[in-house]
């Protein structure tokens, strides 16, 4: 009896996980109006204003942990990491830069998904870090 109950609970959990994954958006349009940048110069990080940023995330496959980055300049490959209340998208750029986008659960009152985008890279040996905050909208 206990074995049947355990199996039933396990199957219920799997069914709920599969149903939840099916409801997740397969693509997003993300807009980041605000942000901050810090450039390392002469032994310290100097703040600079970051310009607005927009891009898309498409072909999200949580099972394979992959997605596509879509920008005006082309497409790139993303790695997907699922969290409890968010999804992280990691882009490792050819030059070794790391870009991370985190899209949190939908804010039903706003109708959009709060999001943060961070970039860690260097330019001619100078570290530059940026962080943006904004929203993503689910696309079909």
Segments the model singles out, each with a brief description of its role:
Residues 1-5:
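Positively charged n-region of N-terminal signal peptides that target proteins for export
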Residues 54-100:
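Predominantly extracellular/secreted and cell-surface proteins with exposed
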Residues 25-67, 98-102:
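Short, solvent-exposed loop/hinge segments that bridge or flank secondary-structure elements
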Residues 17-22:
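Sec/Tat signal peptide C-region and signal peptidase I cleavage site
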Residues 55-58, 100-108, 133-138:
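Hydrophobic/aromatic beta-strand elements that line small-molecule binding cavities or substrate pockets
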Residues 121-140:
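Edge beta-strand at a domain terminus
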Residues 6-15:
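Bacterial N-terminal signal peptides
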Residues 111-124:
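Low-complexity, intrinsically disordered Gly/Pro/Thr-rich segments
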């Amino acid at each position: 009896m206990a074995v049947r109950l355990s199996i039933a609970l396990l199957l219920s959990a799997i069914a709920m996980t599969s149903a939840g994954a099916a409801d997740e958006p397969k693509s997003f349009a993300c807009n980041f109006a605000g942000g901050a940048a810090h450039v390392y110069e002469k032994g310290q990080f100097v703040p600079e204003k970051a310009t607005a940023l927009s891009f898309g995330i498409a072909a999200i496959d949580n099972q394979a942990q992959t997605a596509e980055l879509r920008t005006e300049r082309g497409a790139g490959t993303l790695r997907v990491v699922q969290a409890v209340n968010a999804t992280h998208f990691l882009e490792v750029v050819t030059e070794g830069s790391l870009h991370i986008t985190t899209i949190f659960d939908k804010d039903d009152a706003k109708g959009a998904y709060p999001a943060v985008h961070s970039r860690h890279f260097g330019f001619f040996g100078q570290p530059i870090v940026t962080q943006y905050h904004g929203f993503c909208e689910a696309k079909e």
